[in-house]
């Protein structure tokens, strides 16, 4: 990990909020099928209806591409590939229903894993810093603020911190799937339920 020590917090606080939504997709793998849309502001109930009413055999290739295009793969692993800021999703379909999966994507702050949650650090001079606590020693907290760049770790002096609390806001941002149309969303959900396995039954059965 690379540790950055700055006298000011502006740079880190900026990359720790909604500005991440506009991150460039230059890191998306070559050959990725990008969403055609038109997208919408997906809500859980509407998304459930769209997925449940989809017909035909789902596309593994498009589902895998949507996983990359919506930046899921930047934070989550699937079959050993992807980021580490969030939980491994390879077994997601064996543990959660379609509704659970959609809800976790659309309303990420509703349920937050203790392992991947963030901490709010309230500063003595005023203001606060939000980040995932990686480790700490007698002098510093070491935190990651950008889920798309977990190797960027900031050392925050304990002398500057008045108190801390667990954040009620997920590091995962809402709206990541809002560029997808209903077919693209259905393929993404199929890919998640299949755990990235192209031979899964979801790709051989029709509704």
Language-model segments: what does each one mean?
Residues 82-106, 118-166:
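Gly/Gly-Pro-rich "capping" loops immediately C-terminal to redox-active cysteine motifs
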Residues 111-115:
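Active-site phosphate-binding and catalytic loops of NTP-dependent enzymes
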Residues 1-58, 78-81, 191-207:
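Post-cleavage N-terminal segment of exported redox proteins
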Residues 70-73, 139-141, 170:
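Glycine-centered loop/turn positions within well-structured domains
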Residues 157, 162-184:
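Intrinsically disordered, low-complexity linker and terminal regions at domain boundaries
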Residues 27-68, 85, 96-100, 124-127, ...:
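Electrostatic cytochrome c docking/interface patches
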Residues 47, 68, 106, 110, ...:
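Sec-exported extracytoplasmic/periplasmic mature domains
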């Amino acid at each position: 990990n690379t540790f950055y020590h700055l006298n000011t917090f502006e740079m880190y606080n900026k990359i720790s909020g909604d500005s991440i939504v506009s991150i460039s997709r230059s890191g998306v793998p070559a050959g990725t099928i990008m969403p055609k849309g038109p997208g919408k502001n997906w809500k859980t109930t509407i998304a459930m209806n769209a997925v449940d009413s989809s017909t035909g055999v789902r596309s593994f290739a498009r589902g895998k591409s949507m996983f990359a295009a919506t930046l899921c793969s930047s934070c989550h692993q699937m079959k050993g590939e992807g980021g580490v800021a969030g939980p491994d999703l390879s077994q997601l379909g064996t543990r959660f229903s379609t509704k659970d999966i959609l809800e976790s994507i659309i309303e990420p702050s509703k349920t937050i894993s203790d392992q991947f949650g963030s901490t709010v650090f309230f500063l003595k001079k005023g203001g606060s810093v939000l980040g995932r606590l990686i480790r700490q020693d007698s002098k510093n907290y070491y935190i990651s603020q950008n889920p798309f760049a977990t190797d960027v770790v900031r050392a925050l002096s304990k002398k500057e911190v008045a108190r801390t609390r667990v954040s009620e806001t997920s590091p995962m941002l809402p709206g990541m799937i809002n560029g997808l149309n209903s077919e693209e969303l259905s393929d993404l959900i199929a890919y998640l339920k299949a755990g990235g396995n192209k031979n899964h039954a979801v790709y051989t059965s029709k509704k």
